[in-house]
């Protein structure tokens, strides 16, 4: 079988295109998108966004649920999902610094304020000396919790500590409180064993607690911890990802989040 020079050049060009395509992002179907979310109430909010995306952009959204804070970014990094919606910027920045992920912010979702919850006390004034307080153990939410405890006058952190405070940064602890660092998912169960637990709204909602109704004290809603939609740097501007963002940032989704979280979700866009 003979090939003309023109045919050979055409074949070579096609082969080169296939090789180059294999080195970057996979071919994108802009009518489909796979989004990672936390199981529970956040997934319910995302389901509303998925419905809006289908109605407004003919976008088929597959939601992939997670129960921890580590796996969603790993799944995004390896291409298992197209984007995720579960974290705030300080957490993302820490993950990028620690793991080298090439991830980027697509847009804001909601502020889910953390709060102090208890089965033993009704105000911080009732905390006994040596009381045990449970806080999240991931670096950003640990710092977030310690700053909240400082705002309540329960301890003092060293000056200019920033957002990533640790227990080593505590310089005053007049009640000699014992700070227990636990996985965030374990915090709701810790309420039976500690005087006070600082819990993210996502996990608090799993046991029907809301900041406004049940929190002894609540984080300021003007915090830097607005949650974000995140994609890879390579697909952050992809049509399917951008259309999901536009579907998420709608009044329909904001209304649903307010109802699902009983006022514990504040629109971040």
From Swiss-Prot:
Give compartment(s).
Cell membrane
Lipid-binding residues (covalent, N-palmitoyl cysteine): 23
- Asked whether the keyword Lipoprotein is assigned, the reply is yes
Pfam families linked to this entry: Lipoprotein_9 (PF03180)
Which residues are listed under lipidation as S-diacylglycerol cysteine? Answer: 23
A cellular component term from Gene Ontology for this protein is: plasma membrane
The protein depicted here goes by the name Probable D-methionine-binding lipoprotein MetQ
């Amino acid at each position: 079988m003979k090939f003309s020079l023109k045919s050979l050049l055409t074949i070579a060009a096609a082969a080169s295109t296939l090789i180059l395509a294999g080195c970057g992002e996979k071919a994108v179907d802009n009518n489909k998108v796979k989004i990672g979310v936390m199981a529970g109430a956040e997934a319910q909010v995302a389901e509303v966004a998925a419905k809006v995306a289908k109605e407004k952009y003919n976008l088929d959204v597959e939601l992939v649920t997670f129960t921890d804070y580590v796996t969603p970014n790993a799944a995004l990094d390896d291409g298992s999902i197209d984007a995720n919606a579960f974290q705030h910027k300080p957490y993302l920045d820490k993950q990028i610094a620690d793991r080298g992920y090439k991830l980027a912010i697509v847009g804001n979702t909601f502020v889910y304020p953390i709060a102090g919850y208890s089965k033993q006390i009704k105000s911080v004034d009732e905390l006994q000396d040596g009381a045990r307080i449970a806080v999240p153990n991931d670096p950003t939410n640990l710092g977030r919790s310690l700053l909240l405890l400082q705002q309540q006058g329960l301890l003092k952190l060293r000056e200019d500590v920033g957002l990533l405070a640790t227990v080593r940064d505590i310089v005053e602890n007049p009640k000699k409180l014992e700070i227990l660092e636990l996985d965030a998912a374990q915090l709701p169960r810790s309420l039976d064993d500690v005087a006070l637990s600082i819990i993210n709204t996502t996990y608090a909602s799993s046991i029907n607690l809301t900041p406004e109704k049940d929190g002894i004290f609540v984080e300021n809603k003007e915090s830097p911890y607005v949650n974000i939609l995140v994609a890879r740097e390579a697909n952050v501007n992809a049509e399917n990802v951008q259309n999901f963002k536009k579907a998420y940032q709608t009044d329909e989704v904001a209304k649903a989040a307010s109802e699902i979280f009983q006022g514990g979700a504040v629109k971040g866009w």
